[in-house]
Amino acid sequence: MNKLLKWRKTGKDKPSLSDESQIKTLFNYKRNSVLWSVVFGYGIFYIGRLTISVAKKPMMDAGILDATELGIIGALLFYTYAFGKLTNGFLADRANIAKFMSTGLGVSAIVNLLFGFTTTFWGFAILWAINGWFQSMGSAPAVVSVTQWFSSEERGTYYGIWAASHNIGEGLTFIGTATV
C-alpha cells in the first residue's frame, strides 16, 4: 500500500537551469503540453460518463431497465461524482496529476467495459456509482494544472479553452456511437 501511495506523489525536483532562453522555451512547451493534455484528457473522461446516455433508449426498448431504474443509476453517478470531487480535489493538490488522472480514467474505462457484461439493476447501479467516483478524478486535477501553469491574468483564457473539453468529449461520444 505504501508503494502505491508513493507512486502517486509528485516527483523529485529537476536540476535548475540557468539559460534564460532555454528556460522560456521549455516553460512554454511544458505549459502548452499540460494545457492540451488536460483539455483532451478531460474530454475523454466525458466519453466514460456519457455512454449510458447513448444506451438508455436501447436498454429501455429491450426491457433491460426501466426509466425509474435508469434514473436511480444516473443519480448514483452524480452523488458519487459530487462526493468524489470534494475528496479527490484535496488529493489532487498533493498528487502527481498525470498519474492521478490516468488512474481515474483507466478505472472508469474498465468499469464501462464491465457495464456491458451486466444484466441486473444492482450490477448496473454499483458499477455506475464506482464510475462516478473515478470520473471525479478528472476535473480537480485539470483545474489544479491550469492554476499551477498559468498566471492569474491568463487563467480566464485558458480555463475557457479547458471548458471546451466538455464539448470535445460529447462530440467524440456521439460520433463514436454513431460509427459503432
Tell where the protein language model's regions lie, with residue ranges.
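Residue-level signature of mid-helix packing/kink "hotspots" within the transmembrane helices
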Residues: L50, F78-L86, E170-G171
